[in-house]
């Protein structure tokens, strides 16, 4: 294969059979359970990268079921996002993500810089309770529960929050191990069709684990919970800060 062909066809590895396809990346019936909790501000300050600023001392713990996603298939995800401000405007910083499907792990890390690791998240209904769990190997690291569709949420504020920008810290090393890419990336969700949004009583337990340290942002108080069903498109990102420049 000549160099020109390589340049024309190169998208992702392996060259002749990429681990994920090109977008657009559309999600149908994407289901969230989001439990918002108060944590230690000092712990947040240690992990939120400049130039982002903390908006509050809260974390949104998410369990996300994605049964129909373009190119990525059927999978589940769990992790933590942190409300922040960038140049005075609200958004969220994606701190940790654990999922059970290789293409979105590879694509998420390589294209946008999502902090994805392989694990075993589950989101399901147990009789009258929406239940989310996260296992890293055989070890339970998170359990979230919520009353199933107790109260309907106003769609306008839910949609507004879903349109806010998301931020990622993309890190890719050079072949000698030195940093080659270290960037703050911003991305959005678009073409959002909100099909339902509910709230109810919720509880969240996080357990210490050396390699899935979600409990490093401890739960001090659960302040809100939401259960959301929507269709949406994951847009490509843009670099807003280059730490190596």
UniProtKB/Swiss-Prot annotation:
Transmembrane segments: none annotated. It catalyses: acetoacetate + H(+) = acetone + CO2. This is Acetoacetate decarboxylase. Its EC number is 4.1.1.4. It is an enzyme of class 4 (lyase). HAMAP family: ADC. It comes from Acidiphilium cryptum (strain JF-5). Keywords: Decarboxylase, Lyase, Schiff base. NCBIfam families: PRK02265.1. GO terms for molecular function: acetoacetate decarboxylase activity. It comes from the Bacteria. InterPro entries: Acetoacetate_decarboxylase, Acetoacetate_decarboxylase_bac, ADC_dom_sf. Belongs to the ADC family.
